[in-house]
Every structure is written in C-alpha cells, then in structure tokens.
Amino acid sequence: MRMKTENLLKAAAAAFAALCVTAAGAQNVSNPVLEGIADAGVIKYAGKYYLGGVATYGDFFVSDNLTDWNKRIHVFDLDNDWTHGTGAGNNQVHADDITYSGGLFHLLFSVNYWGDDRHIVHITHATSPTIDGPFEEVRKDQWFENRIDPQVFCDEDGQLYLYMVKFTDGNTIWARPMNSDFSFAGDAVQQFSSQPETWETMDNRVAEGPFVIKYRGRYYMMYNANHTAPEYGNYRLGVCEAASPMGFGPGGKYPWPVVGPDTEPLDNDNTDLIVYGNGTFNPVNLDADTIRFDIDHAIKNHPYLKLAQRGGCEVALNGHVVNAGSKADYRLIPIDNKLVRKGENIITVKRAGKNSQLVALALYDMADAKTGDLMLTPGQPSIVRGPNGWEWWLVYMANKAWKRSQHIDRIHFTGGRLYVDGITSPDTEGFHPVPAMPQHAGTSLDGVSVSDAYLLEVTFAAHSSDQAVSIGDRRISLPSQMSSDAGHVWRIERNHDILTVWIDNVLVCDHESVDKDNRAVDVSGTVEYLSYNDGYDEYGRHFSGWKGLTADDGGLKLGQADVLKGDRATSYEMSVQLDNATPDRGRYGVYAAWQDEKNYVRVTIDAARRMLITENCVKGKTTTSETSLARTEIHYPDVKYSDSFEKQYRFDSDTYVSFILLPRLAPGNNSYARDLSLNVNTQRKFRTDVASHIDFYWLDGDTWRKIEYKTEESGHPDWQKITFAPVCTRGLRLINKNPRDYGHNTYRIKTGRDFSATCQLRIDRRGKTIHVFADNRELATVNLKNNIPAHTGLYSDGTADVHAANVLYYVVKEAE
C-alpha cells in the first residue's frame, strides 16, 4: 500500500538530514546489582521487586527498577520442630521462591544444612497476608517437600505446580501439581537430569534451579547444569521447552547453554600461547611450580593473561610478577609485550600455603580487550517482567571473580527461542540498556492519553469489592471464584481490536474482540498500584491494526507490504521474527523510523544477496549501508537425534552452510572415564586430524546427502576447518567411521552460516540513536540530529513468501 504523506515541520527533515550509520556504541547494565547474595528468588508486586535468598538471613531486598536494591526489610525467622537443636537458622535460608496466590504471599525455600550432627536439606513453606511479612511456616512439625530449589508456577488455568530438585540421578528436576491451598494434587514426576557427554556434564551430574514461565503459548524452564563451584567454572544456564507444565524432558532441551561465563569466548576465539605457542598441543599442569612453554612466532597484537588462583599463588612470567600481593584472582591481566619472548618462556608459581590453588591459566595474543575481573558461574535463575511490563528480565547469581552476587540481564525471544543478553558486566561491549520504566505509574489514569494498543497493569487492594476494568465496550469483572476480600493483580493487553486479560496469572479474557474505535478506560475499585505503557505483543493469528494485511497459522502474511502501525514516539523497541519460505529471494524488513515518504529509516533483509540493508531517506535522497548476515556460531548436537555413534546438529530454519570447524581437543565430559580433579587439561585428548575419522552429511528435505569437503587453515590450532559448496539445510550429521570412536571431540562444533530463512530483526531507538540488531547481533547504529517522534512499520517487496511470525513493540521510558 502507499503510505499517507503528512505535513512536516522543517525541523523534522533537518533531523533526518543528520542520519548516519556508525559503529555500535555501548550502554551497559552495571552488574552485579546486589553484591554478596547468592541463590535467590524475586517477585514483582505492585510496582516493586522483592528478593530473598542466601545471605539475606530472612530479609527481603526491595527495588523499584531491578538495578537499585537500597531497601532491606526483615520478613522471616526459621523456627520449626525439625531444625531445633541444630545449627540451622536464618543463615540456612536458600533459594527463595516468592508467590502471590489466593490473597496470601507464599515463601518457599530450601533449608540447606549439612552438619556434623545431621543433614537437614528440605523445602519449607511459609505465608503472610502482606509482602513485608512476617511470614509464618504453615506447618512446624514437618517439612513441605524434598529436597532443594523450589519454584511455584501458576498456569493460565489457575493450576499450581511445584518444581524442585531431588537427589536421585545426581541432582534431578521434578514437578508436582498442587491445589489452590498449596496441598498436593498428585505425585511428583521426574522432568529430567543432566545429559551425559554434553555441556551439562563437564564435571558432576547436576540439573537444578528450575524456573518456569509461559509465554506465547509455550512453557519455558530455565535450569542449571554442572557443579556450582567457581573452581570448576562450568556452571551454566540452560533452557527446556514444553507444551505442558509437566512435560519437560530431554527432548525439549536447547542443545546449547543460554548463559555461560565470559571466559568461554576468550577460549573459543583466541589461541592460548601456553598450550599452542609452538603450534602443537602442550597441556598445562596446574599443580606444577614451574611451567615452560615455547612460542615460535612474534606477538601480533597484545598479550593478556587469564589467571585464576586463590589462597595466594604469586605468578611470574619470565621473572616478572603479574599479581604481586594478591590473595585471589579470577581476571584478565594485560601483559607488556616485552615480557613475552620468541622461544622458551617460563611461568613460576609461588604458593603461600598448602591451600593455595592455581585454578586456570592461559596467555592470549589479542587485540585490545577489556581487562579485570571475569564473570562466571551464572545460576539459580528467576525470570520476571520488567518495570514497564513488556520486557522479560533474568535475575540470577554469578561470580565476579570469586565473589558471588546478584546480576540481571535482558531476555529476548528469537525465532521462538529464549535468548539471554548476557553474561554482562559494566565492561561488556555493545548496547545493554537498563530496564525500561513504565510511561505512567500511580493509582489512576488521570491525565494519561490512552492509545489503541497498550499494557495496563493494576494491583487492587484487599477488600475492594467492586474490582473491575472497562476497556472500550468491554467490562471485565472479578470472576466469582476469586475472592474480593483479597487483592488481585491484573494484566490487561489491548491491541487495536483484541483484548487479553490475566488476573493473578489466570487467563480470563483470551484475545477477544473489543471496539477498535472506543479508547475509553475505566478502573473500578481501590487501586494500590497502576502502570500504563503503549505497545503490543503479537504472535500466531493474533495480529491486528496492520491495514491490508491478514494472518494465518504462520503469522502475519506480508506479501507486498508498506504499512505503519501505532502512534509516533521518540524512544521504543520493535522486534519482528521474519520467516521466509523462499530464502533465495525477497527484500523485507521494518521501518525503524518513519516521518513521511521522503524522510525515513528502513532496515531490510536482501535474501538473494544475504545482506542487511539500512536505508536513510532524507528529503527524498537515500543513502544505503550494507552488512553481511553471514556468521560463525558454536553449534551443539541435538540430543533427540544424537548418540555416541553419530551427532546431528539442527537449524531452526533453512540455513545456508559452507564450512564446519571441528575441535581438536576433546572436552573431557565422559562422566564414566573422567577424574573429577580440577586439573582437567592433562586428561583431555588432542587429535590433529578430526575430519578424516568422520563422514559428513547434510539434510536435503528428508534425504541425507554426503558432503564432499576439503580442509583449510582455520587460524586457530584448536579448530580444524572443512569447507564445501554451500548447502541449504535444516541439519548436519556427523557419523564416526570407526564404531569404537565415540566422537567426544564433536560434542560441539562451529558452523559457518551464510544466511538463514528466519531472522529476528530488533530496533531499539533511544531518542536520537537507533540500534539495529539481527538475531541479537548489533550490526549498526543510526544517529539522528534531533529527537523527532516517528512511526514504525513493516515492509516487503512482494517477491518472497514472508511472514512476520511475531511482533513486539513498546514505547520506552528510560530510568531517571
């Protein structure tokens, strides 16, 4: 369609005249946000967040924005029959879970006492009519359930479920249905344990810390795997998807961890000169006092030492002490180029005592890098909506060096998959904004100009007998089964002529119709808190307001599209999943900012050329910037199709692949043959030629076809590269030629992806700056001279079969 031209002020054109594409800037969440607190749980209630867990001693920390936790209140004291006479007290409050249900706040946590007298490792349950307590245990004579890490999830039909960890097959995740009074409605059912010979078993058999949400009709469980100790450095977060709350299993797991340590890209992308300095594999013995290594070439960039030690290990490189006086390190240290020699180099380790331990050591030749403490062991997740109600945020513990604290990072959904923008620190490159605040917050909508697409969150006070909300021509009242004596939390999403309402997480109005021309809003009852934010969240067939476009099961059909939606704004986020059923052609994308037909910013995908195109039209004159969409990514085998004989690596959409990188160093994740000492490098097996032991195949429809390849230099001694003619595929298969060769090296590979049929475009505008992301990679930034309101929209040239499978848009108000 042809978009209507509007009269503009000259200032608007001047603003667009200043558009330019530049390198991506940086604005970071400042992790950690709460120091010294480990396994914790978080609840959002009436515009505030409450956090409790390890080292809170029965207290809650309180925040308005997830970043500042300046208030602390005492809410609970451990006092029951089964902990009396032991050392278990408030110091044994672990892994809080805080839920509001039926007019009560429910606090569940693990008592985690491992004493010389006895072990007390159980889950207990306490309640309070108010969030600030005091919480009292429901039963003092017995515990609630076994064993650790509880989480209560309320499904949209009101059914409650308890997720927990039992010590069965290692640490194993179980689920159990509950009644509304928190009594049990059935037996516990095992969900899954850690999968042998995957990233989940780099040391111990651990699956723990479950946290479940439902979003866009799918259930997502985040969990931890591997040992939590930073000495191992293997603790990571994974995700499992399911179609039902008790249907989580190995087949629903993402093959990859969604959050890992920031040491991982260091090792993946850089050569360790201590191990590979002369081009051959020379494992490091961390127990040695003298480590000798050869370097057969000059340093190209700058040397950096990754050093992890505790208990006072003084480390010297060629006689120069790099950590003088330090009792503990887990950091990246810049090294003077002059200290690194061509030929033999010597590292000496002087240990202060018998408990001094060298945990990790590597020397990289890198371009300029951020130095300082490293981030690792992300774990014990809680997932909450952000202050504006649209965003999802992960609250989790992680180590900054050896200190464990609370961190936050943004969650996005990319191609339907849950993705975490982390692990981040203040030094992480790129754009990682703090949580957005609601456009309006208070106890009423007085003075608010309501649009036709928004989120309204209302917390009604207890004993408010007339709780109801009217949206346009629809009035939603409190269901009869919900008590008006209790306060209730409402979530109302209006999208043009579609209305969706949840009360206490229960879906009471499921994408029902509302008069699109009636913007009236009325809130009845005593309001404790209310927030309002423009935006919409669309998926499936639930699209509205896109003039001339229709939706089917694949989403919004774009065809030939040139269409805007919504009011103008100056700060906003727009995320669109674009699915191309004909990935060899088409030009499609989004309007990142539209003033009129002569002044706009458009970001599109050119499928034939596999490029991201950023167009800047100013007074009718267009300049263009192009960025390749090709990328190299770590790729883990899908356990649904893999075993010790063969590995299959799947793609979520048709993907053009032209090379594979194979790790020469086996991971040491065979739990039946591994010594669980920390000094694993000397145990790992190195294979110079991995490819010759494997037959490679690509999936063509439902037929596996053999890949004819050649080997090339990879630029990294730990990776062997094979290249081949590009194939468009949904999967790769690697089969061991020798049945006794179990393919431990290929527990992960790297794949060279030239283009994928599905791409998640995300536009994040903050006033004068527009950040452009494709599949969570920031590829460009557009700068405007002035802060002029603009529309957003969708575009397609009509030459490809393209759907917008989901669209999330909301106006951003930045924290003050």
Predicted regions and their residues:
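Edge beta-strands of jelly-roll/beta-sandwich modules across compartments, strongly enriched
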Residues: 354-363, 527-530, 673, 740-753, ...
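Hydrophobic core segments of beta-strands in well-ordered, beta-rich domains
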Residues: 38-57, 94-115, 137-140, 149-176, ...
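Aromatic-lined ligand-binding clefts that engage carbohydrates, nucleic acids, or primary amines
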Residues: 301-315, 347, 469, 492-494, ...
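Aromatic, loop-rich ligand-recognition surfaces of beta-strand-rich domains
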Residues: 631-708, 713-755, 809
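Beta-strand-rich ligand-recognition modules
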Residues: 285-288, 295-298, 308-366, 483-485, ...
